[in-house]
From Swiss-Prot:
Compositionally skewed regions (Basic and acidic residues) per UniProt: 252-262
CDD domains: ArfGap_SMAP2 (cd08859)
Domain of life: Eukaryota
Main location: cytoplasm
Keywords recorded for this protein, A-Z: Cytoplasm, GTPase activation, Metal-binding, Phosphoprotein, Zinc, Zinc-finger
Protein name, as recorded: Stromal membrane-associated protein 2
Gene from which the chain derives: Smap2
Organism per entry: Mus musculus (Mouse)
Amino acid sequence: MTGKSVKDVDRYQAVLANLLLEEDNKFCADCQSKGPRWASWNIGVFICIRCAGIHRNLGVHISRVKSVNLDQWTQEQIQCMQEMGNGKANRLYEAYLPETFRRPQIDPAVEGFIRDKYEKKKYMDRSLDINVLRKEKDDKWKRGNEPAPEKKMEPVVFEKVKMPQKKEDAQLPRKSSPKSAAPVMDLLGLDAPVACSIANSKTSNALEKDLDLLASVPSPSSVSRKAVGSMPTAGSAGSVPENLNLFPEPGSKSEETGKKQLSKDSILSLYGSQTPQMPAQAMFMAPAQMAYPTAYPSFPGVTPPNSIMGGMVPPPVGMVAQPGASGMLTPMAMPAGYMGGMQASMMGVPNGMMTTQQAGYMASMAAMPQTVYGVQPAQQLQWNLTQMTQQMAGMNFYGANGMMNYGQSMGGGNGQAANQTLSPQMWK
């Protein structure tokens, strides 16, 4: 009888689904792959799709394959699957399978194993009768598998252990409740109302004492006056007591401004001591006494007034060459105000000498009109800048040999004329 009705088909599908939920039927009977969706109903095993193809190659007389979901099942086919299953089938066909045997995973090896198992019956236990095995119920298999769930059904011990814990938890709040009530009453202070009045009187007395203490403290103005009066007036502007005076009086501001001005003047005086200011009329005047050598008898000694040069640093004396007999220049004392106040160190050389082209060159430079060094103290002496630039234009302060020359080294003036001008090569 074929299940043509829809109700029978649904009922058969439900039976197959229940069979697949069994532990042995969750894996392929041949390769042990998970989730078999095919079955050989005459053998009564669930297999995977790869093993189903090999079973079809064995022939219908050995194995008949059907899909669990796609094909229609009959009552006879469902009955065969219920009687066998993967557990009983492996007990029959793999009875003599070695314990160290590894199930193959490659298709040719799997096909050889399936043929040995079902076609050649190489591992089959021939002493067992298939019909008796089919009619045998699965009580033995269920009893062998049931001890595991029975062991899992022992959580009663844990419940007994949890019960005393609950009792202890219930006793804890009961014991803690009377303890929590006592501090609440003490905090409110309802039992001792008299103590509150006493405390209030004590606090009022304490406040009165505090007010008396504040009244006895002197005012900040009086403290500041005492501090200002005790401080010395000649103190520095950045002293600590003045910085601590947080309430200065208006009269002290004028004193502070006067001190600040004095401090500024003292700072400026430091710079003034290094660079003293000279009057314009005394810039080009000669020092107190200046002696000229015998070669220039026309220049007498000039004695300027002491009021002009008084209190100033003595001017440095440099060396100026004096023409001699052999073309060399002899040293001559030169004032600091000479040539517009130029320092004599500007004219200085390592040997204190200067070379010239000819002995008579410096004669014109040294022979200046007597009006420059006038004897009258009140006369304002000024230097003629045009003569200054003309005479200084021919000077070369940095020669090739580190000496000051006029276009020629020392001893080289014999071959040049007296009125020869400077060499143009020196100004390149």
